[in-house]
UniProtKB/Swiss-Prot annotation:
NCBIfam families: MIP. It holds the Pfam family MIP. Aquaporins contain two tandem repeats each containing three membrane-spanning domains and a pore-forming loop with the signature motif Asn-Pro-Ala (NPA). It comes from Oryza sativa subsp. japonica. GO terms for molecular function: water channel activity. This is Probable aquaporin PIP1-2. InterPro entries: Aquaporin-like (IPR023271), Aquaporin_transptr (IPR034294), MIP (IPR000425), MIP_CS (IPR022357).
Length: 288
């Protein structure tokens, strides 16, 4: 009997150490996770690498396709005489969000799938990529957007001119401040989602599935469009706004164009600061 009691006692205490749960479990993972070093500000060696230019081409093509599909969708809605005869605002939002989902999925392994200068700017502030790469991405994104809108106009010039070409403007009844605020908050939501979905620390955990990252990013774009299309037509992407404005090239398309650069860049900067300083507390970790 004593032997059996000893076996029971040993069995009950075989795993004497308590397993951490909740935040405690995350704390144990934190000890094993090592923060990747920040990207250098300038990386001249990138200019000699084919992967650098391949990534830029991927950004160009993705933004080209993004503008092509979304501008056509906007034109179709604006050309309709009845809300029931077209996809409406919900369809426009699905078009933008769905394209971002598909294009991020296709290009994430090549360029990171930014497709947006504001996203690139936010990731640059977080030292996720060099200034060299960030500037190259932004140029290629803008060129892709211009070409995408240009192809749409080439196919349907008359309809493009009469429906506004998908250019972003502050809607009547709203002030410039309203438009700027909508762009700041909308871009904050998008870029914060990008940071959360692509967080290397989360990728290191077994419970996180990196292949699903495009889904929340695309869904964030969808939701922001639902909320802000009535205010600004939803920019949150300076390349998208620039491409449509250049090809449409009417006076009112340029009246408030600065909003669609200043707003997204402020929103991206705030999202980068919030994620890196508040959520991840990276500056404080470096001091410890």
């Amino acid at each position: 009997m004593e032997g059996k009691e000893e076996d029971v006692r040993l069995g009950a205490n075989k795993f004497s150490e308590r397993q951490p749960i909740g935040t405690a479990a995350q704390g144990s993972d934190d000890k094993d996770y090592k923060e990747p070093p920040p990207a250098p500000l300038f990386e001249p060696g990138e200019l000699k690498s084919w992967s650098f230019y391949r990534a830029g081409i991927a950004e160009f093509m993705a933004t080209f396709l993004f503008l092509y599909i979304t501008v056509l969708t906007v034109m179709g809605v604006n050309n309709s005489t009845s809300k029931c005869a077209t996809v409406g605002i919900q369809g426009i939002a699905w078009s933008f969000g769905g394209m971002i989902f598909a294009l991020v999925y296709c290009t994430a392994g090549i360029s990171g799938g930014h497709i947006n200068p504001a996203v690139t700017f936010g990731l640059f502030l977080a030292r996720k990529l060099s200034l060299t790469r960030a500037l190259f991405y932004m140029v290629m994104q803008c060129l892709g957007a211009i070409c995408g809108a240009g192809v749409v106009k080439g196919f349907q010039k008359g309809l493009y001119e009469t429906t506004g070409g998908g250019a972003n403007v502050v809607a009547p009844g709203y002030t410039k401040g309203d438009g700027l605020g909508a762009e700041i908050v909308g871009t904050f939501i998008l870029v914060y989602t990008v940071f959360s979905a692509t967080d290397a620390k989360r990728n290191a955990r077994d419970s996180h599935v990196p292949i699903l990252a495009p889904l929340p990013i695309g869904f964030a774009v969808f939701l922001v469009h639902l909320a802000t299309i009535p205010i600004t037509g939803t920019g949150i992407n300076p390349a998208r706004s620039l491409g449509a404005a250049i090809i449409y090239n009417r006076g009112h398309a340029w009246d408030d164009h600065w909003i669609f650069w200043v707003g997204p860049f402020i929103g991206a900067a705030l999202a980068a600061i919030y994620h890196q300083v508040v959520i991840r507390a990276i500056p404080f970790k470096s001091r410890s």
